[in-house]
Amino acid sequence: MIIGYQSLLDHQLDVSYANTDSDQRWADQVGDQSYTFPSLLPFFQKSAHFTPPNLTKRATFNATPLYDPSAFDNTKGGPLQVSYGNWVDPTINALSGALRAAGIGLSPSGFSSGSLLGGAWVTSTIDPDDATRSTSESSYLQDAIQETQMTVYTHTQASKILFNANKKATGVTVLTQGLEYTLSANKEVIVSAGVFHSPQLLMVSGKTLKACI
């Protein structure tokens, strides 16, 4: 397991989700307007610190990014570095020209304002100061470790959530290199073990139908 796993290995693309009518219908059906794009946009803005493209270094034909500055808000102090790379892939550069020739222009607002139609130079999770990848580990975890008393247990996997008689989570049974022990919780247990392990962990902890185990 790698700390910052997905953001450490993915393609570094940083886009918002689409602002569509389907989101509004979903919000209306469940009676919760917090699912709409305008409600979620501030959270996207809160996480990121945007740096405009360096056009001097990106001085390549068809490589000028179009974006909507209002999609970003650096006053919120987001730790995740978001910018445009200084190097441009020649194949993508050619694709940009091909889209224009086919009458498919680049989106004037990019892919950070809720519209994902057409083409766009996409923002990336790259720190422009040193051109390194900005991950959940480098942008969030390192600051948290320095500012709090957080302890990271590496090479450790949760095997069961523990509950008291009142069905309140009190800790987690974990395994480190075959050694089983318990980590106790003072306030709460946050389940964030991935799309597969999170439900599996809940099931083995008795929080689902026995038939699913």
Regions found by a protein language model. Name each.
Residues M1-I213:
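Structural core of flavin- and non-heme-iron oxidoreductases
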